[in-house]
Amino acid sequence: MSVDQATVRRIAHLARIKVSDEDVPHLQDELNAILRFVEELAAVDVEGVEAMTSVMPMPMKKRQDIVTEGEIPDVILANAPEREDHFFKVPKVVE
């Protein structure tokens, strides 16, 4: 599998990342290298290997479950393609 320049632009658009035309070939090469590595990993036989989340056993750090006022709608909605008042506006998908 490989990524073309149009796919790089589409990924950038979906991620809301501004990518210049001169950066597209470099990102294309990097994404293709990542995909090649993933294909190598997919070829590894892991039959009988127990699944794990970390090489070293580490307890998960938990944060306090505290209700806050938030009061940062502009920060939260900064990357929203469309918004209305203090809400994300999404296209209608169900008739």
Swiss-Prot record:
EC number per UniProt: 6.3.5.-
One example GO MF annotation: glutaminyl-tRNA synthase (glutamine-hydrolyzing) activity
Chain's role: Allows the formation of correctly charged Asn-tRNA(Asn) or Gln-tRNA(Gln) through the transamidation of misacylated Asp-tRNA(Asn) or Glu-tRNA(Gln) in organisms which lack either or both of asparaginyl-tRNA or glutaminyl-tRNA synthetases. The reaction takes place in the presence of glutamine and ATP through an activated phospho-Asp-tRNA(Asn) or phospho-Glu-tRNA(Gln).
Coiled coil: none
Subunit structure, interactors included: Heterotrimer of A, B and C subunits.
Name the record gives this protein: Aspartyl/glutamyl-tRNA(Asn/Gln) amidotransferase subunit C
Record keywords, A-Z: ATP-binding, Ligase, Nucleotide-binding, Protein biosynthesis
UniProt record similarity statement: Belongs to the GatC family.
Biological process (GO), any one: glutaminyl-tRNAGln biosynthesis via transamidation
Record flagged with keyword ATP-binding: yes
Catalytic activity: L-glutamyl-tRNA(Gln) + L-glutamine + ATP + H2O = L-glutaminyl-tRNA(Gln) + L-glutamate + ADP + phosphate + H(+); L-aspartyl-tRNA(Asn) + L-glutamine + ATP + H2O = L-asparaginyl-tRNA(Asn) + L-glutamate + ADP + phosphate + 2 H(+)
Organism this protein belongs to: Methylocella silvestris (strain DSM 15510 / CIP 108128 / LMG 27833 / NCIMB 13906 / BL2)
Family matches, as Pfam families: GatC
Superkingdom of origin: Bacteria
NCBIfam families: gatC
Keyword match Ligase: yes
